[in-house]
């Protein structure tokens, strides 16, 4: 296992900067509290996908509010993985590994689709390698649950891998993730 430790805000300078920009204490508190809520949403999405073998597994987490000051300390215990970027720097990838990556990500996206989740940011930085020749999808920070959306969905993601309908802020569905995966696999070949 690995433990990811996060502090929201990272330090008091973030609070001071917001205060200098004219925000009052309550607004600053709400601003950072929303960050924590977004992180909790990402954790809950990943927990809903826990049974999927190609999704990064969060084993446990704890969010601890700080006493008498604005801030939260967040501890996330997850499986120990290597990010794909580091894997590529250390090893490169054969065609067979790129195919394996593609198949693993298709399984991950199938699990997302079954839970009505659009990842919206399929890219090298959000894929991990477990050391057993298996790749896993992580970082659901900008994913969107379909049932929570109405007509037009917001533009999120990385432009290099973004489907045209997302870029144009048109209505889209889970197929935008398949498009992004295809672009990424093409670049890896």
Give, region by region, the residue ranges found by the protein language model.
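Activation segment signature within eukaryotic-like protein kinase domains
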Residues: 101-102
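Short beta-strand micro-motifs within the conserved protein kinase catalytic domain, predominantly
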Residues: 57-72
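Conserved short submotifs of the Hanks-type protein kinase catalytic core
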Residues: 69-83
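Conserved catalytic-loop aspartate of Hanks-type protein kinases
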Residues: 177
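Protein kinase catalytic-loop region centered on the HRD/HxD motif
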Residues: 107-117
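Conserved activation segment of eukaryotic-like protein kinases, specifically the C-terminal portion
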Residues: 152-165
């Amino acid at each position: 296992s690995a433990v990811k430790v996060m502090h929201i805000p990272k330090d008091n300078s973030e609070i001071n900067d917001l205060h200098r920009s004219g925000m009052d204490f309550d607004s600053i508190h709400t601003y950072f509290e929303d960050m924590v809520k977004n992180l909790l949403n990402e954790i809950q999405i990943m927990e809903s996908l826990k049974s999927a073998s190609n999704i990064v597994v969060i084993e446990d987490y704890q969010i601890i509010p700080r006493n008498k000051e604005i801030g939260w300390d967040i501890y996330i215990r997850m499986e120990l993985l290597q990010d794909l970027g580091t894997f590529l720097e250390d090893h490169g990838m054969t065609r067979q590994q790129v195919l394996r990556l593609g198949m693993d990500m298709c399984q991950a996206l199938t699990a997302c689709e079954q839970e009505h989740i659009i990842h919206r940011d399929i890219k090298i930085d959000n894929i991990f390698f477990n050391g057993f020749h298996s790749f896993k999808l992580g970082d659901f920070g900008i994913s969107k649950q379909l049932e929570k959306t109405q007509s037009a969905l917001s533009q999120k993601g990385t432009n290099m891998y973004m489907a045209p309908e997302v870029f144009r802020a048109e209505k889209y569905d889970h197929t935008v993730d398949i498009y992004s995966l295809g672009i990424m696999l093409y670049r890896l070949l």
